[in-house]
Structure formats: structure tokens, C-alpha cells
């Protein structure tokens, strides 16, 4: 059995699979983690499970050494980072894998083995949109994340206070809460749909949504398929390729 880890800018997401059922645990991303701290925080999740490998996608390089030590000292397992890719499995269009976020590569691996033509919208710290056609990663778009856009607005505008985001059934807000909800929720909906229409004007691509901020936009993105923890699933695919 393996342990999978998605190191994002906001959260660390751990997952392992028993009898085709994934179990997940989330910790906040902190740069002062030690391997002992991780072990203590994960004690109730890991219990007495034995792992052969810790498979990692990381966009926070400063944590990589700690993760290696954690795997070696506490898990007694080998560690595998996304550090190579086979062109026949996922064509990066001439780019080095190091120039592309490993979370994007993990998601693209998941997609490339299941769909001929797919657009993925990953709603995390950033909103990332990328297109995979015939196992080729065409490229990506990175925009401010939904939650960060909202928090940035509230923090930078002195007269605005935090509100509950709820989409009104009209095109113009009648008060500050409605106006902010429209700007953040419908604004991100139009941003996403605008890029989808540019990338896939004929509507032939499979559209997939993933990421922790999906809950904020699920009411406006309900026409698209949601895949929970796509990075973890992509890490499982990565292990199967390179084990």
C-alpha cells in the first residue's frame, strides 16, 4: 500500500487506498513543519498502516526535504516525487517537467489516460485551467483563486466587510452582499466559461472540475463533472507508470 501526498500552497492533502476506497486527511500548509510534527499530526490518520512508498506532488519546494525525512524516519518507506515523465504517456509539448507545476502534471496524467480531449478547471489557491488533447498538454492558464480574490477584495477595500457569498437570482445586486456575491461567484463563472469557449469553441472537449474551492462555485458550474482529489488519483497513476 502507498501513501499519496498533494502539497499545495494552502493545504497538504494525504490519501491512501484500502479495498478500492480512498481515505483522506488534510493539514494546513506550514513552512515550519518538522518530520516529528507531521508524524504527530498524522498519528490518528495513519495509525499502524505500513506504506511501501510515499508518492508526492509538491508546489512548495521548501517542504520537500522534510517530507523525505518524514518518509524515511517515520513511515520507513521510500519516497517518489513527480520528477520525470514519459512522452508517450503525457507529451509536455517540448517543455521541461520542472517548468510545470507537479499538480498540473498529476491532474494531466489522470486526464490523459481517460479522455482523448479534456479541459480541466482546478479551483485551488489559484484557478488553473489546462487542456489535454491526445495525451498532449497543450498549455495552461493561471488566474487568482476564487477564495483569494474574495479575501483580497475585502482586505483592500476599507468599507467592505466579510459577507456570506450567495448568488442572487438577478443580474445586479441590490445591496453590498448581493453585489459582492455576483462579482466573485458569477465573475469567476464568466472567467472560466470564457476561457472554455476560447479553448473549445465547438464544444467537443470533456470539461472536468476539481479543487478545494469547488464548493464556492458548484451552483454555477453544475453542468460540468466534478472529480474529487484529482491530484491524488493522478499520483496513483504516476506510481503505476514508474514503479
Swiss-Prot record:
Pathway: Cofactor biosynthesis; coenzyme A biosynthesis; CoA from (R)-pantothenate: step 1/5. The keyword ATP-binding applies. It comes from the Bacteria. It holds the Pfam family Pan_kinase. Its cofactor is NH4(+); K(+). One of its GO terms (cellular component) is cytoplasm. Substrate binds at residues 101-104, 176. This is Type III pantothenate kinase. The lineage of its organism: Bacteria, Bacillati, Mycoplasmatota, Mycoplasmoidales, Metamycoplasmataceae. The gene is coaX.
Amino acid at each position: 500500500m502507498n501513501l499519496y501526498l498533494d502539497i499545495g500552497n494552502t493545504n497538504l492533502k494525504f490519501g491512501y487506498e484500502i479495498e478500492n476506497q480512498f481515505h483522506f486527511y488534510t493539514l494546513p500548509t506550514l513552512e515550519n513543519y518538522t518530520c516529528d510534527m507531521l508524524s504527530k499530526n498524522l498519528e490518528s490518520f495513519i495509525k499502524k498502516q505500513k506504506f511501501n512508498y510515499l508518492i508526492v506532488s509538491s508546489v512548495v519546494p521548501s517542504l520537500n526535504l522534510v517530507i523525505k525525512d518524514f518518509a524515511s524516519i517515520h513511515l520507513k518507506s521510500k519516497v517518489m516525487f513527480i520528477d520525470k515523465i514519459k512522452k508517450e504517456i503525457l507529451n509536455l509539448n517540448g517543455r521541461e517537467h520542472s517548468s510545470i507545476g507537479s499538480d498540473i502534471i498529476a491532474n494531466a496524467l489522470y486526464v490523459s489516460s481517460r479522455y482523448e480531449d479534456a479541459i480541466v478547471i482546478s479551483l485551488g489557491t489559484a484557478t488553473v485551467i489546462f487542456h489535454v488533447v491526445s495525451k498532449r498538454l497543450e498549455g495552461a492558464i493561471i488566474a487568482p483563486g476564487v477564495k483569494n480574490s474574495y479575501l483580497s477584495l475585502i482586505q483592500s477595500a476599507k468599507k467592505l466587510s466579510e459577507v456570506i457569498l450567495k448568488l442572487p437570482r438577478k443580474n445586479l445586486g441590490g445591496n453590498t452582499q448581493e453585489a459582492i456575491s455576483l462579482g466573485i461567484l458569477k465573475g469567476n463563472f464568466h472567467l472560466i466559461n470564457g476561457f472554455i469557449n476560447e479553448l473549445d469553441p465547438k464544444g467537443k472537449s470533456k470539461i472536468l472540475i476539481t479543487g478545494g474551492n469547488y464548493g464556492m462555485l458548484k451552483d454555477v458550474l453544475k453542468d460540468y463533472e466534478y472529480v474529487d482529489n484529482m491530484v491524488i488519483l493522478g499520483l496513483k497513476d504516476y506510481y503505476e507508470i514508474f514503479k
